[in-house]
Every structure is written in C-alpha cells, then in structure tokens.
Amino acid sequence: QAFVANFERPRDPHPERTTWSQEWYDKFKDLEIPVSKGYVKPIADPITVTSEFGWRTSPITGAQEFHNGIDLVNGNPNTPIFASADGEVIVAGDANYFDWYGNWTVIKHADGMYTGYAHQSRVDVSKGQKVTASQQIGLMGTTGPSTGEHLHFQFMDEFYPSSAAHFHNARDYISF
C-alpha cells in the first residue's frame, strides 16, 4: 500500500503547460515540413501535380491502373528537367525500352535508388554519364502515350521493378 502511494501523482500538476503546448501544436499542426533526403525537384517552380502516385483511372485507357510515379507540370513550354541527385545515367532516350514512357532517362543514385524521368521531348545525357544534382538532363515533353506535355517522375529501389512494391512515392523524397 505504501509503495503504490509513492507513485501516485496529481493527474495534471501543471495545467498551464498543457494549454501552452496545445496552443503551439494548433499553431503549427498544418505546417508542411519539407522532406529532406538529399533530392531536389526535377523541374522549376511553380510545380503542379497533375496525377499522384497510386491507383487511378488511366487517362489513356480509362481502366484502373497503378500509377508508379507522379506527373508534374509548371506551365512553361520546353521546361528543363534536372537530375534530382548525383548519380549515373543507366537509360537515356531509349523510347523502345518501355514504349509507354516515350523518351526517358533513368539515373542510379548512391543510396541505391533510381529516378525515372519520362515523356521527354529532348534527352541531354547519355548512358554511363555521371550527373550532379540540378544538372539539366533534358526537356519536358509528351512522347509515348501522353495526354499533354508533362514529366512523369518516379522513384524505384531496383531497375526495373518486378512489382509495384518497388516503386516509391516521390513525395516521400521531395516536397512538391
């Protein structure tokens, strides 16, 4: 009995702390914390996301499909596309590799991740080339099955993934 009594404390010994904490929480709860994993945006702001990562109705076929990337536009024609991190180009402009991507670039990064940049109107790098973060790698376009000029941007933990589980949401790496 005496042992239990030593651990009994008032439920809220400092109610002012709870009020203060709640006020700060309410003030900042909607603040978007930027994701920082060493990656930068692949196109310049202002960026509009036109199709999110995940299940969607295909704008081409009308069927349900898993969209393995994120579609980005910024309203400017011939928008430059930049490498999101340092790495080595493993695919450059090979429209026949995966015909639904049109002209595209894939970069392997030091952390083992791969980034893909699809539907490019122009590819400015070549296979085997080393690139640095923010280096221009091409121009946004609408090659391959596409409903308009945009960048299909994707993260993968292997090339080329055997299942959807190996694709990652770009928003987990970069704040858009």
Question: What are these model-derived regions, one by one?
Answer:
Residues P80-A92, V125-M140:
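Short, well-structured beta-strand-loop connectors
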Residues G38-P46, T79-D86:
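Short coil-to-beta-strand transition motifs
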Residues T50-A83:
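Short glycine/threonine/proline-enriched tight-turn/helix- or strand-capping micro-motif at secondary-structure
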